[in-house]
Amino acid sequence: MHLTAAQGWLELGNHEEAFEELEQIEATLRGHPDVLEVRWGIYASIEKWDYCLEIGSAMVRLDPARFTGWINRSFALHCLKRTEEAYEQLKEGLRRHDEEELIWYNLACYACVLGKKFEARKKLEKAIDIGGDGVKARALDDPDFEGLWRSGEKK
């Protein structure tokens, strides 16, 4: 009940109420990956990337079969200006989740930011193959791909 309420508050943009709902969850359950995922969302909404990194790392450690932990950890690293680390760690997640469009997409973003334009294009193509035209539209508006589009790679 509290987890669902926290998710609802987070979707409404009220991170304080979401946090209060999570605090009402029994202490022994607060480390559950579902709870951690919402907690990550709360801290991401207020750009507390150090906390997001801790939570994302815990998610990967507790449940490596859940792809969102890999995404959350690498995104926090990227936001902390540790994009090379984000890229390398997310490549580990790709070994387990090679059919997840968001992993391919984020790897493409990080590759582009790192100046690896050929890799970025290939990874973005794979993300589009998996996720369709919506992925392509999102990429066209993503500032992480600016270097790819400036170099004439727009398709």
Describe the residue ranges of each PLM region.
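Alpha-helical segment of the N-proximal tetratricopeptide repeat
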Residues: 1-45
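"A position-specific structural signal for the A-helix of alpha-solenoid helical repeats
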Residues: 4, 38, 72, 106, ...
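Register position in tetratricopeptide repeats
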Residues: 11-12, 45, 79, 113, ...
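A conserved position within tetratricopeptide repeats
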Residues: 26-27, 60, 94-95, 128, ...
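Boundary/linker segments of alpha-helical solenoid repeat arrays
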Residues: 33-34, 67-68, 101-102, 129-141
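Alpha-helical adaptor scaffolds
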Residues: 34-102
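TPR/TPR-like (Sel1-like) alpha-helical repeat modules
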Residues: 112-135
